[in-house]
Design a protein with these regions (language model features):
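Extracellular or lumenal secretory-pathway regions
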Residues: 1-118
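C-terminal or internal capping secondary-structure element at the end of a domain, subdomain, or sheet
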Residues: 133-167
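Short beta-turn/strand-loop junction motif enriched in small, turn-promoting residues
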Residues: 60, 129, 145-147
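Extracellular structured ligand-interaction cores
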Residues: 39, 67-71, 126-128, 137, ...
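A short, structured loop/turn motif at beta-sheet edges
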Residues: 75-83, 127-138
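Extended beta-sheet lipid-handling architectures
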Residues: 119-126
C-alpha cells in the first residue's frame, strides 16, 4: 500500500499530464516514444501501516480508452522482490476529471474517498520475483482510494492498495 501524498519518492509523466513531476526538475516523459507513460517510485507499507519496502509503478496509458498496461516492482528488503502486471481501467478517474472541468471545480475532495478497483478482471498477475518470491506466481489487484484531486497543482491524494495472492 502506498499514498501519493506521503510516500512518493519520484514521479514523472509527459509535461502537462495529470500528475506534476516530483521532485521538481525530474525529467519529463516528453519524447513521443514514451509520452503515454507514467513512472512512479514509492515507499510501501503493509496493511497495518508499517514501512516494508519500496517499489515502482510503470504504465503505458491509451488516453482514448483510459486503459493502461501496468507493471509494479515491489522490493521488500530481506525478503526479495515481486514483479506484478495488470491491465488497468482508469476511466473512473478520467470521467471524474472531465466532470471537474465541466463544473469548473478544479479542486475536489472525496469523503468518503472515491474507491475503484482498477485492475481489469482476470489480468492481475504475479509474474515472478527474487529471494523468497523467486518461484512466486499468483494473482493481484489494485484498489485505489481517491481523497482529493487538485487539477490546479496537478496533485492527487490517492492511496493504492495492492492485494497479492501467491501460490
Amino acid at each position: 500500500m502506498f499514498s501519493t501524498a506521503t510516500d512518493t519518492i519520484a514521479l514523472s509523466t509527459a509535461s502537462g499530464g495529470l500528475f506534476a513531476p516530483f521532485p521538481t526538475g525530474i525529467p519529463a516523459l516528453d519524447e513521443p516514444e514514451i509520452a503515454d507513460g507514467f513512472l512512479g517510485a514509492f515507499k510501501i507499507h503493509d496493511i497495518h501501516g508499517n514501512l516494508v519496502g519500496f517499489g515502482t509503478e510503470q504504465e503505458v496509458i491509451d488516453f482514448d480508452t483510459a486503459i493502461a498496461s501496468t507493471t509494479f516492482t515491489l522490493t521488500l528488503p530481506g525478503r526479495g522482490t515481486l514483479m506484478l502486471s495488470q491491465i488497468e481501467d482508469t476511466s473512473v478517474y478520467f470521467a471524474e476529471v472531465e466532470d471537474m472541468i465541466a463544473d469548473e471545480e478544479y479542486i475536489r475532495s472525496f469523503d468518503p474517498p472515491l474507491v475503484a478497483v482498477t485492475t481489469v478482471q482476470g489480468t492481475g498477475r504475479v509474474i515472478g520475483g527474487t529471494g523468497e518470491f523467486r518461484h512466486a506466481r499468483g494473482r493481484m489487484r489494485e484498489i485505489d482510494y481517491l481523497y482529493e484531486a487538485n487539477l490546479i497543482d496537478r496533485a492527487f491524494n490517492l492511496t493504492d492498495l495492492i492485494q497479492v495472492k501467491i501460490w
